[in-house]
């Protein structure tokens, strides 16, 4: 090939590469990892120990219970359709949900201390 053809190919490849680099932040390639506060980190550990059997943290898809990604960022809670507030989430965790499908959600009120509940809520806010 002549030098002129190679120059054209190289320029074209550079334009494509530059376009990919510029599009990366918009496409999710360059997503930054969320840095959790100490309380949210403690809540994440509690979530992994108590909740992951039934709930996903990274998606909204149902496992046994609803996926909880964005649970406190949405307008309403999954299944109950109550407003997505800290108070409603805390009540759901404490009292459980006997009408949960396909299985009822057990109450965790007697299992989690006030500090544990606060840490868990702090973690759920990051989802």
Question: What does each model-found stretch correspond to?
Answer:
Residues 62-63, 70-127:
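Extracytoplasmic electron-transfer domains, predominantly the class I c-type cytochrome c fold
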Residues 26-46:
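Electrostatic cytochrome c docking/interface patches
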Residues 1-9:
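N-terminal secretory signal peptides that target proteins for export/translocation
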Residues 32, 43, 57, 78, ...:
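Generic anion/oxyanion-binding catalytic loop in active/binding sites
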Residues 13-24:
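Bacterial N-terminal signal peptides
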Residues 58, 66-67:
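Short, solvent-exposed linear motifs at loop/edge-of-secondary-structure regions
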